[in-house]
Amino acid sequence: MALISLTNGYLSFSDAPLLDHAELHIEPNECVCLVGRNGAGKSTLLKIIAGDVLMDDGKIQYEKDLVVSRLEQDPPRNAQGNIFDYVAEGVGHLTDLLKEYHQISVQLEENYSDQILSQLEQVQAKLEHADGWRFENKINEVLLKLGLNPNTKLSALSGGWLRKAALARALVCDPDVLLLDEPTNHLDVEAIEWLENFLLDFQGSIVFISHDRSFIRKMATRIVDLDRGQLVSYPGNYDLYLTTKEENLRVEALQNELFDKRLAQEEVWIRQGIKARRTRNEGRVRALKVMREERRQRRDVMGTAKLQLDTSSRSGKIVFEMEDVSYEIAGKTLLKDFSTTILRGDKIALVGPNGCGKTTFIKLLLGEIQPTSGKIRCGTKLEIAYFDQYRADLDPEKTVMDNVADGKQDIEINGVKRHVLGYLQDFLFPPKRAMTPVKALSGGERNRLLLAKLLLKPNNLLILDEPTNDLDVETLELLEEILTDYQGTLLIVSHDRQFIDNTATECYLFEGKGHLNKYVGGFFDAKQQQANFWASKAVEEQAKAKKSEPLKEESAVKNDRTSKPKSVKLSYKEQRELEQLPQLLEELETKITVLQAEIADPAFFQQAHDITDAKLKALADTEAELETAFLRWEELEEKKNLVEGKA
């Protein structure tokens, strides 16, 4: 039985309805990806499923006591309190208890007293009774993986960080159905991969919207296409959907062509005059009227954007040269002793976590900031086009047309003059929309407009900082084709793994503490090389560690004889942690054994790169987690023994 059933759904805000008597059924334990062009109504459909928007007609039914959680595309900006409280509200029945526990814990850390400790113990007992620790641990895990400080005030968050907090809130409540609108937006690759694994373990149904094709391929068990008001279900994976959809559109185009040809013939016949109005032909006249109405009601497929680059003369052979470049800010090293030569025609992707220094790297190359040490030399004859992730190159008060042509009627691309309205239609801006102020545009429309403006500028060095945000898949794929054929030098900052893999020939991976390493190939090739490099390094470190163990043990014995036990005491939190660590260690060891067996299989490396890469990374992460957990267990055990010995 379906968890949610939408039947005969109809909703319209304009001439063309978003839902035109559509149907959708969400079954238990499935992961549905909702696809469609920008503006098709995908986000509105999620709001309908969540019960936040009512349809004009139709019915939606839910299984009894069904719990639905939704991540909004644009989280509310007027939320109050700190991140922990906001996320805990997603749990519902335990919200107040979890908030109280967090607040008292913070008070205890800042100002210890027996009274506060007593309050904490009372709340802990209530949480224990209500099985609340599971949710408290989940909240802390999600916040950690998304890089969120639980005590940060929501009012201090930018839109991207607020969206992360909203994602955390949607994930923690154990719903039956999880609705996610662009969950990978503003997440770096590491966070996206964690989210994928988190959702794969989720015991419920998921309906999500995403333009991240790698994410869709990994997650979706079914594709539902919202196309011109209709919901069409495609069982199976994303690639099967693409093939089937292409064939369906081909058949539809052929049928429309035949219909239009027959309609044209009937129109010629009706104009022949009196013969058409004889009684014996009244049926044919009525049929023609039906055909006219059918053609009037038909909604044609939306066109795709038409992109082309205005390339300039070639740059010099060497575009940039960096020699032992370091950069520090506020005591943090973003780049350390990095050297490279970027040549004409190179297509390089900068990959790393949020805040690691990718945009800083570009600013260093462009001379907008100076390195702390080292030298950067620019090549000759450079003409640069820069796609800024903050969209600062757009004037929100000006119209779409004026942003591109600055009040002129004509633009020039590759030596050919065109009317600005015709050019903007290539980017899916009809004349009426071209006269709209930029501040009224959606995120996807702003991205298309920035591309339209950027591609007008003659260039031989193209820098794209997060170009894929809010672009629909069709426009993304067209952009990829153009960049593949681009003869200049390309620098990309993106968290879209498929986009990087399809456009870059080399990846610079930020690996922490200012270390930046270069790998040949697209994203998945680079990650495979990185995994192999760190795996071999881990083996070397283990070998060194084994050699030094006898010396460490001898030193430890001497230290034990001479050192005096310190006065220490385990806190309640530490006692709980110590009790839980043995089970965690056992689980991690089991997980490592399973992963090692999978990797040892001869067929392992015959799988797709993203699968092998994920397994290798999971093994490295789990081994690191085991080591950290074991060291923590040793630390707490030693602390406990010192206390007992003193007593």
Curated annotation (Swiss-Prot):
Compartments where located: Cytoplasm
Domain of life: Bacteria
Pfam families: ABC_tran (PF00005), ABC_tran_CTD (PF16326), ABC_tran_Xtn (PF12848)
Record key words, sorted: ATP-binding, Cytoplasm, DNA damage, DNA repair, DNA-binding, Hydrolase, Nucleotide-binding, Repeat
Entry's Gene Ontology BP terms: DNA repair
Compositionally biased spans, kind Basic and acidic residues: 545-563
Positions of ATP 1 binding: 36-43
Binding-site residues, ATP 2: 352-359
One of the record's GO molecular function terms: ATP hydrolysis activity
Occurrences of domain ABC transporter (ranges): 1-253, 320-546
Record's keyword annotation contains Nucleotide-binding: yes
Keyword presence, Nucleotide-binding: yes
Similarity comment text for this entry: Belongs to the ABC transporter superfamily. ABCF family. Uup subfamily.
Task of the protein: Probably plays a role in ribosome assembly or function. May be involved in resolution of branched DNA intermediates that result from template switching in postreplication gaps. Binds DNA and has ATPase activity.
Annotated domain remarks: The C-terminal domain (CTD) helps bind DNA.
Name used for this protein in its record: ATP-binding protein Uup
Species of provenance: Haemophilus influenzae (strain ATCC 51907 / DSM 11121 / KW20 / Rd)
